[in-house]
Amino acid sequence: MITFTLCLLALIVGYFTYGRLMERVFGPDDRKTPALTKADGVDYIPLPTWKIFMIQFLNIAGLGPIFGAIMGAKFGSSSYLWIVLGSIFAGAVHDYFAGMLSLRHEGESLPEIIGRYLGLTTKQIMRGFTVILMILVGSVFVAGPAGLLAKLTPESLDATFWIIVVFAYYILATLLPVDKIIGKIYPLFAIALLFMAVGILVMLYVNHPALPELWDGLQNTNPEASELPIFPIMFVSIACGAISGFHATQSPLMARCMTSERHGRPVFYGAMITEGIVALIWAAAATYFFHENGMEESNASVIVDAITKEWLGTIGGVLAILGVIAAPITSGDTAFRSARLIVADFLGLEQKSMRRRLYICIPMFVAAIGLLLYSLRDANGFNMIWRCLLYTSP
């Protein structure tokens, strides 16, 4: 537990030290933000900072800091190091500058910012690349949550019903003003995920399980170590628990809602550090699980269910179900919303009117429905789309 505690403290100290240094490098000032200068009641809407933080945290987190950290824990104490060092020096820095550049440039989406610094050709490539990525993300995260919801209602509502419900929610979350659905639901889901993480953290110190220490060595403890080396597999497994390029596509959503550049460090850098803390907690909890039950289990959702029910009881089980269902849904809806904004930016279409939003959303959702039907009808369809997503993820 000593290494775990030191890593936890390092993440907190990193926010106040290295995060402040990065803030000085960027140099936020008192200029008016896009939420104030371009307010349109749809995407550019001033929101409270605490709510922006919660939305940003859930936007970038999803299932990554839970499932990824659990699988990464099989590699031993080196997973702790990657989560801590990656979050402080890579992930949070990336997220902060991605968000602040969008904030400084009128809330522009990722491809437009890239075009400012790398030229027109790169911008055009990133426009197509990023929109495809967002549609793939949204399409992938429909059937999974719907299947889990169907298991909760096996006698009354089947998977087809829940697929329709989830997709209908995606359409509404993409079209409606950001404060109508995302601004109301996301903070609640974020609080649930944080409450679950804090509960696990408390139980770690109550149970005080034997966790690997750095001085025991950084050897690969994965039972398939010969086939799954620490580099690159551990880094890929933990992924957004330390750094993810996907976050840069999400930050402009909140850059359009901030009322001060000085809120950037708590929102962008702070949300990534919080994700790192959540990932560290789950990596430690998974290490305990593997120590008690062996490493044969590879289904992260089973491990989450077992840990939360054992340590947090019925409430923990409910939170686990909520997290496993809500996290992918909140990744899917903001992916579609990001795609709409990216297309609107490069076509120069204002998004205040519903009609212009529909111009973009109708063909986008038609394409998504096609991908979804392909994944459902073809036994290998989902795997094919998932591999495409992995290949295109920045």
Predicted regions and their residues:
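Membrane-interface "cap" regions at the ends of multi-pass membrane proteins
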Residues: 10-66, 233, 260-263
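Flexible loop linkers connecting adjacent transmembrane helices
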Residues: 20-45, 69-71, 77, 85, ...
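Hydrophobic, membrane-embedded alpha-helices of multi-pass small-molecule transporters
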Residues: 48-64, 201-209, 218-280, 322-331
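Helix-loop-helix connectors at the membrane interface of multi-pass transporters/channels
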Residues: 107-121, 143-162, 251-276, 301-306, ...
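Transmembrane alpha-helical segments of multi-pass small-molecule transport proteins
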Residues: 126-133, 152-178, 193-196, 353-370
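Hydrophobic alpha-helical segments and their helix-loop junctions in multi-pass secondary transporters
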Residues: 138-142, 146-155, 160-161, 173-174, ...
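Extracellular/periplasmic helix-exit of transmembrane alpha-helices
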Residues: 205-215, 269-306, 376-377
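Conserved small/polar residues in nucleotide/adenosyl-binding loops
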Residues: 391-394
